[in-house]
Amino acid sequence: MSEEQLRRQLYDSFANRAHVYRLLFEELRAELGEAKAAGLMGRAIYRRGAQQAARYAPFAPADLGALKEAFVGGLPDGGALFAPEVVRCDAGGLEVKFHRCPLKQAWLDVGLPEAEVAALCRVAAEVDRGLFEAAGFRFHADTYRPGSEGCCFLHVRPGPAAG
């Protein structure tokens, strides 16, 4: 199998994940309402992120340089899938702006309204919150807003044990 075929499969797998999220969200929203659907999915996605946190825990609570190398350096397709820009990396914080997101793109490609894409992005970003918080860092993300460029802007801060 060629590198291009593998790359296409990688991108297709992210699009598939996006569509599973979307369909699940639509079903839950129809049964429970948007707030409960988002909360339920967000908690499950957070837990999945937390399950993957061990690879970043050695850098907690405050080795943000090593965290940057491990996280950004480990992004799929050499980072091309998300087009990360490290905006800040110092003792006070790590900030990474994603200029692309395969989930967001998949939702836009099927014609979802931007407001719905933004809601799904907020839910999907819980994976990163789970990942970084369970690893021992403080974290928040600015997620996609209709009309804005790119997607998530991740803000990682030293964890509680760092003082």
Where are these regions (language model features)?
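N-terminal accessory segment detector
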Residues: 1-122, 130, 138-152, 157-163
